[in-house]
């Protein structure tokens, strides 16, 4: 089947020269970003603002999700100084909000949870004012691993459901209920924790299914939601079934807020970490005259 042509509202230019400085720093510190690995269409905008989502635990994923462009090979050993390097980058960039994520590492005993916790601790030690957001895998339902991450006290803990239950075959090795349980367990472990999830639209989901997932997330105590358009990385990946109009994204945002979410980012180019700083600002607005 021939791919659906992208509409005008999804024509976004990537300008490599605009983020040469950021890429130089990442290369110097031997760091990866999901912006690069997942071929994010927002890379020029975010790198131009000196914002990035750091990818820890290497560049290689142990799962074979049909929507994702992150490398799927034999994972390499962990970099011993990775957490310290991320903290150094946060300090040098003067970041007020940082997002940390990783590929899924089912080959590691704790799924990489200890590295997440170490990274948070390292960032806190050199840049205590920085808000730290984690976007974690499911750790195969290992709640001890999850507890190690929760105990590191991130400002936001994210885990993406990605799509509706009927389409979960695109998420190799994942389970819808397990992902929901992870978000609920995190809130049980730390009732005041801000939790977040993201969904891709255009995979073939029905509107009623989308609203049902929103209800499930709210029942799991998830207060933050991101909705964005799925874009197939190549012809080898799961094909786009529909390009959702910007007006519909806005309607979904209004619906989600009415249902009870604290903050929602919903637009074609929204990704989990896009405008990440907005979520906490909606809960803790700056004093009048600032921001």
Curated annotation (Swiss-Prot):
Subcellular location: Cytoplasm
Protein name, as recorded: Lipoyl synthase
Keyword Membrane: no
Cofactor note: Binds 2 [4Fe-4S] clusters per subunit. One cluster is coordinated with 3 cysteines and an exchangeable S-adenosyl-L-methionine.
SUPFAM superfamilies per UniProt: Radical SAM enzymes
PANTHER family: LIPOYL SYNTHASE, LIPOYL SYNTHASE, MITOCHONDRIAL
Binding-site residues for [4Fe-4S] cluster 1, renumbered to this chain: 35, 40, 46, 273
Cofactor entry: [4Fe-4S] cluster
Organism: Citrifermentans bemidjiense (strain ATCC BAA-1014 / DSM 16622 / JCM 12645 / Bem)
CDD domains, sorted: Radical_SAM
């Amino acid at each position: 089947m021939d791919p659906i042509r992208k509409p005008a509202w999804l024509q976004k230019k990537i300008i490599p020269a605009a983020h040469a400085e950021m890429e130089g720093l990442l290369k110097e510190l031997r760091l990866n970003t999901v912006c690069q690995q997942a071929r994010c269409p927002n890379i020029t905008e975010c790198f131009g603002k000196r914002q990035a989502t750091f990818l820890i635990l290497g560049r290689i994923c142990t799962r074979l999700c049909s929507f994702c462009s992150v490398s799927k090979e034999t994972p390499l050993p962990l970099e011993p100084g990775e957490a310290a390097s991320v903290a150094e980058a946060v300090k040098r960039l003067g970041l007020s909000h940082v997002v940390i994520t990783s590929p899924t590492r089912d080959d590691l005993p704790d799924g990489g949870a200890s590295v997440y916790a170490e990274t948070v601790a390292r960032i806190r030690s050199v840049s205590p004012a920085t808000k730290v957001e984690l976007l974690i895998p499911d750790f195969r339902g290992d709640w001890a691993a999850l507890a190690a991450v929760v105990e590191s006290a991130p400002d936001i803990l994210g885990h993406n459901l990605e799509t509706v239950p009927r389409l979960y075959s695109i998420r190799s090795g994942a389970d819808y209920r397990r992902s929901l349980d992870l978000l609920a367990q995190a809130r049980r472990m730390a009732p005041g924790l801000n939790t977040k999830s993201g969904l891709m639209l255009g995979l073939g989901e029905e509107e009623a299914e989308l609203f049902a997932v929103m209800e499930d997330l709210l029942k799991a105590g998830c207060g933050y939601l991101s909705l964005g358009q799925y874009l197939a990385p190549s012809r080898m990946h799961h094909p786009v079934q529909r390009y959702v109009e910007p007006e519909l994204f806005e309607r979904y945002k209004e619906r989600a807020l009415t249902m009870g979410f604290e903050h929602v980012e919903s637009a074609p180019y929204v990704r989990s970490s896009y405008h990440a700083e907005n979520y906490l600002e909606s809960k803790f607005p700056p004093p009048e005259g600032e921001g």
